[in-house]
Structures are given as structure tokens and as C-alpha cells.
Amino acid sequence: MNGPATRKDLMIVNMGPHHPSMHGVLRLILTLDGEDVIDCEPILGYLHRGMEKIAENRTIIQYLPYVTRWDYLATMFTEAITVNGPEQLGNIQVPKRASYIRVIMLELSRIASHLLWLGPFMADIGAQTPFFYIFRERELVYDLFEAATGMRMMHNFFRIGGVAADLPHGWIDKCLDFCDYFLTAVAEYQKLITQNPIFLERVEGVGIISGEEVINWGLSGPMLRASGIPWDLRKVDRYECYDEFDWEVQWQKEGDSLARYLVRLAEMTESVKIIQQALEGIPGGPYENLEIRSFDRARSPEWNDFDYRFISKKPSPTFELAKQELYVRVEAPKGELGIFLIGDQGGFPWRWKIRPPGFINLQILPQLVKRMKLADIMTILGSIDIIMGEVDR
């Protein structure tokens, strides 16, 4: 009697684009030898909407609602980078109060993004309970956003030279209460997850990246800091008013999925420290730049003349981008979010190149999953933290 036939050839499997662990419309073509991954080819572009080309025939204010659709879980950062470029090109000053409000909103957005990374990451590796806990805290962040901006997501809050509105009455006290509560919630996560033996079995030593590799691949954010390189643009570039606060760059040296988890968890507590200091030290004054500029320096036109150019939340349609090249960047939750902007002395950018952290961090995935088990793909991909709106643009 013949024994059961065994399969000798390799198997090619499509994972995604609608697999729940793909976090969007990512498709992986996997070559498997039983449970072992031999090769992995990511297929991108299912969510491509031409965001860079759209920017070339919109003014900055017209384009602001589009940018919140890149990384739609951390929209404050895409708005920040969109106004930072024209501000630097036009040498527009941001009032101190507006800068503090921006920092508060950016760090709240970082917390919300890390929370919605943590829940699905835990669900991917078999722990469903934290998925419900993170929504409890994330809802409080969105309540704060809604009170300040009118929107839970897609806030459209940043403006050239400031922000769209001042903080409402009572908002600061409400946010301080949230900070006190959230520190206990993070301690609860650590107690529930960090020492869990099943969790450690799934993430420890999985997806290791060395410090040399992260630099060669151009990775950034928690991916970079989890491999022993304490590089954070908030410390390096000192944009907005981050250098006025007392906080530490969070990093680990192991470079595995556990290290990336620990970095993000620690970053949430650091964000709370920054928010608390900003709320307690927020200065008075205007929340927007109320400057008015004139084209024609030789004569003094009427205030309602076309020669006037208004800065602030309602910039004139005649607001021009200087004929220069500029690269601006911020430390987004997923890494370095940058824009290469070329002005052409017109209302529209001549070129608007986006440097998305998720797209670049994703490039190392095929190398990480080779010779790993099929089940480890969810762990490794989850630890990278991608949003396909930003990857495909």
C-alpha cells in the first residue's frame, strides 16, 4: 500500500488585499514551503489617488482637506507638514500660543495613532481584549479633538501662520484630566501585555533589524529607535516649540517586534508629559498670524485692493509661493513625514513630493519575513505600522 503523497513543489499564495491583517488594501504574493516563507512580494497602489498631482493645481488652503486622507489616523501631522512648507518659504512667523496649541494637538494625535496601532497589532497575534480597551481611551482623545476643532477625524485645523480657532473654554482642564487618566491606562496595558508569556513568545526575537540595516534602508520613527538609534526629529530639528519642554527620546536596542512595541508604548507616556507641560505653560496672545502684506511697496493701496496679500487662516487667493526649493519634515507617529516643495512664484506649488514614512518602512518587509513562519508575517507587518492611504497616496 502506498503512503500519502507529499507535496514537493512550492506554493504561491495571495495574502490580501482584503485580508484583515493587511490593515488596508495591501497585497502580498507569498511563496511558501509548507509553513516557511521563501519569498514575499508586496503589491502596492490599490489606494493610489494622485495626491502629489492634485497639489499642483490647488492653493495650499484648497489642498489642506486632501492631506488628511494620507495617514487618516494621524491627520494633525499631515496638516502640520502642509503649512510648515509655505511658512518657511514665505518667512511667516507663527505666534507662540499657536505653536503651543499645535504641539498639544500633534501629541494627542500621536497618542491616538499609537493606540490604534496597539489594538489591531494585539488582535493580529491573538489577543482580542486590548482591542476594546484602546477604543475606550481613543474615544477620549477624539472627544478633545471634536471640542477643539469640530471634527473627530480629518480636522482641517492647521492654517498658514497659526491654527483655525483658539482652544474653547474649559478645554485645557478637560485635557489635563485626560492626561492624568491616560497614564493609569498605559500602566494597565503594561501590566496586561508586556509580561504576558504568550505575547512574548510571539514577538520576542521576531523581525530583528540591526542598527546598520535601518540606516541603509532609510527607516525612521519607532522602527529606527527600536534598533538602538535614538534619533527623533523633535529633538534634532527643534521645530515648533519642542525644545522648551522636558522629555526624553524613547529607544531600545534589540531591534525586534517587542522592541518596537516597547518604544511606542513609552512614546505615549512621553507625549503625555509634553502635553501636560504645554497646557500648564501655554502663553496668551493671538492664535494666528494677522499680518498683511502688499505686493506694491512703492504705493500704498487701499485695504481691499488686489495688491494686498493676507496671511493667516484666510490667505488671499493671490498668496504666492516663492521661487525656491525646500524640504520640510516632522516626526510623525510612523516616522519621518517629509515634503519636498518647489515654489514657482505662483499660487500653486510647482512640485509637491511626499516622503511617507509608511511606504519606506514597508520596503524591508520581504527581507524580514523570509525564512520565517507564515504566522509571523502578521507580527512583523503589525510591528511596522502602516496605513495604506499614506503608502499609496
Curated annotation (Swiss-Prot):
Q: What is its EC number?
A: 7.1.1.-
Q: Where in or outside the cell? A: Plastid, Chloroplast thylakoid membrane
Membrane topology, as annotated, equals: Peripheral membrane protein
The protein's role, per its UniProt record: NDH shuttles electrons from NAD(P)H:plastoquinone, via FMN and iron-sulfur (Fe-S) centers, to quinones in the photosynthetic chain and possibly in a chloroplast respiratory chain. The immediate electron acceptor for the enzyme in this species is believed to be plastoquinone. Couples the redox reaction to proton translocation, and thus conserves the redox energy in a proton gradient.
NCBIfam families per record: PRK06075.1, PRK07415.1
Q: Gene Ontology cellular component?
A: chloroplast thylakoid membrane
| Stated name of the protein | NAD(P)H-quinone oxidoreductase subunit H, chloroplastic
Gene name in the database record: ndhH
Name the enzyme group at the top EC level: translocase
The source organism is: Cucumis sativus (Cucumber)
A Gene Ontology biological process term: photosynthesis, light reaction
By sequence similarity, the record places it as follows: Belongs to the complex I 49 kDa subunit family.
Recorded catalytic reaction(s): these are: a plastoquinone + NADH + (n+1) H(+)(in) = a plastoquinol + NAD(+) + n H(+)(out); a plastoquinone + NADPH + (n+1) H(+)(in) = a plastoquinol + NADP(+) + n H(+)(out)
What highest taxon heads this organism's lineage?
Eukaryota
